[in-house]
Design a protein with these regions (language model features):
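Conserved Walker A/P-loop ATP-binding site and its immediately adjacent core
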Residues: 103-107
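Conserved beta-strand hairpin/beta-sheet module of binuclear metal-dependent hydrolase folds
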Residues: 2-64
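Active-site metal-binding motif and surrounding structural segment of the metallo-beta-lactamase
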Residues: 47-102
Length: 108
């Protein structure tokens, strides 16, 4: 059961700034790191820890919540920005095991 949510990111798939983006939002974030944003993700706290989306910034995002053991992972859809962090779960990285994976029908 989860009783608290942490916003771990609130930007579009690649975060901000994005590679090759010349819009003011990205240019400003390059000049001021306080304006940078990580890709959208949520941490679910309670008896265990759940993660919604596995982004490219998963290391920084989990550091924000003291690197909890992940019991559940939700992937809402298969855009690259929502799944890029999956490689970090493998043996060569964090060697995660026994994580319950929840996916939308579009992912299957």
């Amino acid at each position: 059961m989860y009783n608290r949510v942490t916003l771990l990111g609130n930007a579009q798939d690649a975060g901000r700034p994005q590679f090759a983006c010349t819009k003011p939002c990205c240019e400003d974030a390059r000049l001021n790191s306080e304006l940078s944003r990580m890709p959208v993700s949520l941490g679910l706290h309670g008896d265990s820890f759940g993660l919604i989306e596995a982004t490219r910034c998963i290391d920084k995002q989990l550091t924000m919540v003291n690197n909890p053991k992940i019991s559940d992972l939700w992937i809402t859809h298969a855009h690259l920005g929502h799944i890029e962090g999956l490689g970090q779960f493998g043996k060569e990285s964090s060697n995660q095991k026994n994580i319950q994976l929840h996916c939308s029908d579009s992912v299957y």
